[in-house]
A protein has these predicted regions:
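Terminal targeting signals and extreme-terminal segments of soluble enzymes
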Residues: 1-137
């Protein structure tokens, strides 16, 4: 895959990611970086980033990482996702996500995403499995 193809696939984010404010920073086959500003719209009643927003950030970066590693004609969807919440991320902070492969196989890919706060401390660690599929209408 050429650099142009990789960037086109990686930076062509779905509408849900744009709605969240997902910002892709860089995309390489073995590391994808992204960020998300924590706004009141993404918070829970305690004034910190909602767990669902953290999981959505991780799911989107994991999907992006898989998409740039797929053979031509294939697509992906999440098969399994597990999140360990470690620390809160407060409104006004930025959640930074780093996604790296644990396994890149023919039928599944497993990714680990570490989400950190602005102070660099880990807020969540997510492990997800993506299945490689042929898309059918």
């Amino acid at each position: 895959m050429t650099r142009e193809e990789l960037d086109r696939i990686a930076f062509d984010q779905p509408a849900f990611a744009r709605l969240l404010g997902f910002r892709l920073v860089s995309a390489e086959p073995d590391e994808v970086l992204a960020g998300l500003s924590v706004t009141e719209d993404l918070s829970n009643r305690n004034g910190v980033m909602h767990g669902g927003a953290i999981m959505a950030l991780a799911d989107n970066i994991g999907g992006t990482a898989t998409m740039i590693n797929l053979p031509q004609g294939k697509t992906t969807t999440t098969l399994e996702s597990k999140t360990n919440f470690l620390r809160p991320i407060r409104i006004g902070d930025t959640a930074r996500a780093r996604c790296v492969p644990l396994h890149k196989g023919r039928t599944t890919m497993v990714w680990q995403t570490t989400i950190t706060r602005g102070d660099g401390k880990p807020a969540a660690i997510v492990t997800q499995t993506q299945v490689v599929i042929d898309w059918r209408e």
